[in-house]
């Protein structure tokens, strides 16, 4: 994936907004004001030339540990709470995995919203239907 593909994919989720509170070289993506993806663009104070293109994702502590142990391209996030955030060097990871992790980050943040808001972003599981009768 490239920067534009990541941006387009992340903005495709319901309720996502983007801003640049940390300068022109970083885009943050938010759901109801809560950041769940931070995308480094390069240049400026946060140049990616030495480290490579990356994004930071908010994931559960257990998931962060799991991904860091499986992928060299997933590391504790620079400038974020390392327990809850990982840097993903997305050019070194399959696109489908990057998309899966972005979606996972979105759903994690959505799951922490108040119930009335949460229902808007997390689809309810379908009711089981057996012989045409909802269970």
PLM features: residue spans?
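Charge-dense, helix-prone N-terminal extensions
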Residues: 1-135
């Amino acid at each position: 994936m490239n920067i534009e593909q990541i941006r387009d994919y992340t903005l495709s989720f319901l309720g996502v907004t983007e801003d640049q509170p940390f300068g022109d070289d970083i885009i943050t993506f938010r759901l109801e004001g809560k950041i769940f993806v931070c995308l480094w663009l390069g240049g400026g104070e946060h140049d990616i030339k030495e480290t490579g293109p990356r994004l930071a994702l908010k994931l559960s502590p257990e998931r962060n540990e799991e991904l860091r142990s499986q992928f060299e391209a997933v590391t504790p996030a620079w400038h974020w709470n390392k327990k809850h955030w990982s840097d993903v060097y997305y050019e070194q990871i399959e696109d489908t995995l990057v998309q899966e992790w972005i979606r996972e980050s979105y759903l994690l943040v959505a799951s922490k919203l108040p119930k009335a808001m949460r229902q808007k972003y997390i689809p309810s599981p379908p009711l089981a239907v057996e012989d045409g009768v909802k269970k």
